[in-house]
């Protein structure tokens, strides 16, 4: 199973956002949840003067969290990644996360 990290592209496999994909903004390991860009948006009502970022207050929209078990890591081609390792590609000087896919033999 691939470990989910910030910046990964994931696809939702369960829940009301099933089938949608996005980039991971934050991983909350203690809660077992992830925050995915443009998915599970929630509205928060904020009073005037409560925040330096939004001093006028109002209704804010932000990304909610999704359970880690409800998402899977996908590659650039939107296919699931089964295994990954840290290593060097041929001719590369820096280490990177290399992804492998399990192909079904028929």
UniProtKB/Swiss-Prot annotation:
Record-linked InterPro entries: KOW, Rib_uL2_dom2, Ribosomal_uL24, Ribosomal_uL24_CS, Ribosomal_uL24_KOW, Translation_prot_SH3-like_sf
GO molecular function: rRNA binding; structural constituent of ribosome
Record's GO cellular component terms: ribonucleoprotein complex; ribosome
Signal peptide: none
Biased composition range(s): Basic and acidic residues: 84-97
UniProt entry keywords in alphabetical sequence: Ribonucleoprotein, Ribosomal protein, RNA-binding, rRNA-binding
Top-rank lineage group of the source organism: Bacteria
GO terms under biological process: translation
Entries under CDD domains matching the protein: KOW_RPL26 (cd06089)
Residue ranges of the region described as Disordered: 84-106
Protein family according to the UniProt entry: Belongs to the universal ribosomal protein uL24 family.
Subunit structure of this chain's protein: Part of the 50S ribosomal subunit.
Function (record text): One of two assembly initiator proteins, it binds directly to the 5'-end of the 23S rRNA, where it nucleates assembly of the 50S subunit. One of the proteins that surrounds the polypeptide exit tunnel on the outside of the subunit.
Name of the protein this chain belongs to: Large ribosomal subunit protein uL24
GN (gene name): rplX
